UniProtKB/Swiss-Prot annotation:
Keyword Membrane: no
Ribonucleoprotein keyword on record: no
Domain of life where this protein originates: Bacteria
Taxonomic source organism: Staphylococcus aureus (strain bovine RF122 / ET3-1)
Disulfide bonds: none
Protein name: Nuclease SbcCD subunit D
Keywords, alphabetical: DNA recombination, DNA replication, Endonuclease, Exonuclease, Hydrolase, Nuclease
Assembly and binders: Heterodimer of SbcC and SbcD.
GO biological process: DNA recombination; DNA replication
CDD domains for the chain: MPP_Mre11_N
Family membership noted in the UniProt record: Belongs to the SbcD family.
Role according to the record: SbcCD cleaves DNA hairpin structures. These structures can inhibit DNA replication and are intermediates in certain DNA recombination reactions. The complex acts as a 3'->5' double strand exonuclease that can open hairpins. It also has a 5' single-strand endonuclease activity.
Length: 373
């Protein structure tokens, strides 16, 4: 049996003001073409199909087109669950009707102990839920953390487990020790959101969404597919794609399959003038770029200048300010006003004040002192 594991499509994502629908359309078209080659028995999408609870019309249309090609044209069964970014009601609309075409959508706990059986493999679904939702569902006020809530869910599933069959869990959560990125919205505020690996011991394999790194956790049977695209600059350089999971005679193996996106996220460090004069290495001018530059404080609008050469510049950081405070502590009380100004100017521009600048500043300081007298 062949299963394709994917998650975290985040359709409708906007990165630093840039709409990513073109990139998402490109990668989904590639994903569909790959599925024609793979001919899987089922596709699992482990949450966060959309980036927001109320996705745009274009994002909804993009999902419908992709799912239509995969499920209706290629006739591949699909199981999808909701993630913390998805609007459950919107994603679940028409779910009972879609099941006639083997498109299984799960957004709540009503079916957590009723597996979806495909080719003798039992797929248990555990969509994302807040601690409050789990507390309400189980009518148990003692549930205060995700660990407690997920443990309660697994205890509910346990009696239904067929130990003779292969049992797979699909969920959207953070496993303790998993690598995170900036684009992952925290699941909770003020409480620990991670879940210990041991809670999943009753399953033969676990397919997860939420963490965007495809190798977020090192485990033989607990796997994240990672996101289809790089969605924050903390993910720059990360491989993106999907997992191919095969089951032969009860033995489960998986391999990560990378996909090449239309554009990459790239971080460029250096001197402002070198970048403007195109003396730094940029993999692709069309990439989404974050520049971390020195010596640009004298430039009125450096971002505009950068965008004229690199149109997809999305972020700009003045590296001058990124210094080690412990090694650059200045006892201000021991410095006179002129010395402080000279040090500040040198720190910002890496230059010394000219004689003319020094003279003007001294005159200003002397005038201020006379006013005080």
């Amino acid at each position: 049996m062949k299963i394709i594991h994917t998650a975290d499509w985040h359709l409708g994502k906007i990165l630093n003001g840039k709409q990513l629908l073109e990139d998402q359309t490109y990668i989904l078209d590639m994903f569909v073409e790959k599925m024609k080659e793979e001919e899987p028995d089922i596709i699992v999408i482990a949450g966060d199909l959309y980036d927001t609870t109320y996705p745009s019309k274009d994002a909804i249309m993009l999902l419908e087109q992709a799912i239509g090609k995969l499920n209706l044209e290629l006739r591949i069964p699909i199981i999808m669950i909701s993630g913390n970014h998805d609007g459950k009601e919107r994603l679940n609309y028409g779910a009972s009707w879609f099941e006639h075409n083997q498109l299984f959508i799960r957004t709540d706990f009503t079916s957590i102990n009723s597996p979806i059986e495909i080719n003798g493999v039992n797929f248990y679904t555990l969509p994302y839920a807040t601690v409050s939702e789990m507390k309400h569902y189980f009518e148990d006020d003692t549930i205060e953390t995700h660990q407690q809530g997920i443990t309660r869910c697994i205890e509910t599933i346990a009696p239904a487990i067929d130990e003779v069959a292969v049992n797979i869990l699909i969920s959207h959560l953070t496993v303790q020790g998993g690598k995170t990125s900036d684009s992952e919205r925290p699941l909770t505020i003020g409480t620990v959101e991670s879940v210990q690996k041991g809670v999943f011991d009753i399953f033969d394999y676990v397919m997860l969404g939420h963490l965007h790194h495809p190798f977020s956790i090192e485990d033989d049977k607990i796997k994240y597919s990672g996101s289809l695209l790089q969605y924050s600059f903390s993910e720059a350089g990360q491989a993106k794609g999907y997992r191919r999971v095969t089951i032969n005679d009860g033995i489960i193996n998986d391999v990560f399959i990378p996909l090449k996106s239309l554009r990459q996220l790239e971080i460029i460090s250096g001197e402002y003038n070198d970048v403007i004069n195109e003396k730094v290495h940029v993999k692709n001018k069309d990439n989404y770029l974050h520049f971390k530059l020195k010596n640009m404080s004298h430039i009125t609008d450096p971002m505009m200048s950068l965008k004229q050469i690199y149109p997809n510049t999305l972020a700009l950081t003045n590296e001058t300010f990124n210094y080690n405070e412990e090694n650059n502590t200045i006892e201000i009380s021991e410095k006179d006003d002129m010395s402080i100004i000279e040090m500040f100017y040198n720190h910002i521009t890496d230059k010394k004040l000219s004689d003319i600048q020094s003279k003007k500043i001294k005159n200003i300081l002397e005038n201020e002192l006379r006013k005080e007298d």
